[in-house]
């Protein structure tokens, strides 16, 4: 998905900002891997909710920081799950890149990337896809009439998190210099290529989730 976002954003900005967009997308993937390894995977899917004395905070996991997979489960499936979590952390972070294109310094964007992939996105994953109180997979008490929430493909977990962060960032930064004077258009061919790549990257997850739901109904 990083490739899709990169092409979509490159096609949407002025040509002089192409290199900046590409560097930020590559940086997203790299910093997401580091932060997901250091703290993200533990906050998202750590062993239990033991940040409080009752053991029930329902918002973040803990334990096993600086890890790729659980020490009790090093199967290929667990490793694939870690890889999947890392790619979605990077994807959620990259959503903001397009929203503030041509308006943010690289240092400011780097700081945001560290915070979102390490400390904002992982608790959302825990609440929606882990053992958090929003999750339908939780064995204990759940919100929404004890039904919880099922997010098959990340529309809430990934895209809503990135979208809210993008709205906040765009609102804080404001319009670009020179607005409303139009800048030279980007390249529509890259926009189309990016959209097609994102479609292909996204289509497998909903199909697999739907198949699982049907098999357990």
Residue ranges and their predicted role:
Residues 1-217:
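Hydrophobic alpha-helical transmembrane bundles of multi-pass membrane proteins
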